[in-house]
């Protein structure tokens, strides 16, 4: 079983928050870090993003994502607002009530798809096909290096 999760941080020590998330998720593969502009129209600092692969089913991935956000001090004050750590389950084996899989906006987000290809060049997004074939706007996406 494999889960694909996207992590982002734009508050505080962004790298430390990402490292915490990677640790809590027990990731077996971690993409390079990318810096991206925020999505959603709210003025805020840029994000650092990574994608990880984990040996978790959908329920386990969701539970660990919530735990990582809690440990990083995530406060849900404004939708698409700034956050210490945001962890999205992009895809995972199994069903979990309340989780829409694949993530409903994954196919249009370069900060998910490009790092995903770094850890799995043959990745397939169910319902959309090979990730390498999805057209996404890479403007504003900067690869920084390893976490």
Regions found by a protein language model. Give the residues of each.
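N-terminal beta1-alpha1 ligand-phosphate binding loop
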Residues: 1-37
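Short histidine/acidic/glycine/proline-rich micro-motifs that form metal-
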Residues: 11-12, 53, 118
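Basic nucleic-acid-binding interfaces
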Residues: 56
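Flexible, gly/pro- and Lys/Arg-enriched active-site loops
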Residues: 31-48, 59-147
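Anionic group-transfer/hydrolysis microenvironments
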Residues: 8, 51, 90
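Conserved hydrophobic/aromatic beta-strand scaffold that supports enzyme active sites
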Residues: 4, 49-53, 113
């Amino acid at each position: 079983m494999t889960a694909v999760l996207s992590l982002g941080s734009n508050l505080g020590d962004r790298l430390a928050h990402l490292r915490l998330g990677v640790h809590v998720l027990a990731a077996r593969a971690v993409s390079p870090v990318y810096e991206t502009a925020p999505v959603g129209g709210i003025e805020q600092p840029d994000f650092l993003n990574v994608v990880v692969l984990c040996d978790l089913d959908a329920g386990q991935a969701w539970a660990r994502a919530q735990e990582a956000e809690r440990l990083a001090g995530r406060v849900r004050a404004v939708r698409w607002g700034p956050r210490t750590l945001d962890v999205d389950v992009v895809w995972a084996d199994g069903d979990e009530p309340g989780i829409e899989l694949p993530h409903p906006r994954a196919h249009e987000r370069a900060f998910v798809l490009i790092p995903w290809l770094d850890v799995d060049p043959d990745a397939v997004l169910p319902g959309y096909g090979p990730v390498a074939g999805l057209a996404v706007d890479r403007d504003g996406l900067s690869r920084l290096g390893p976490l």
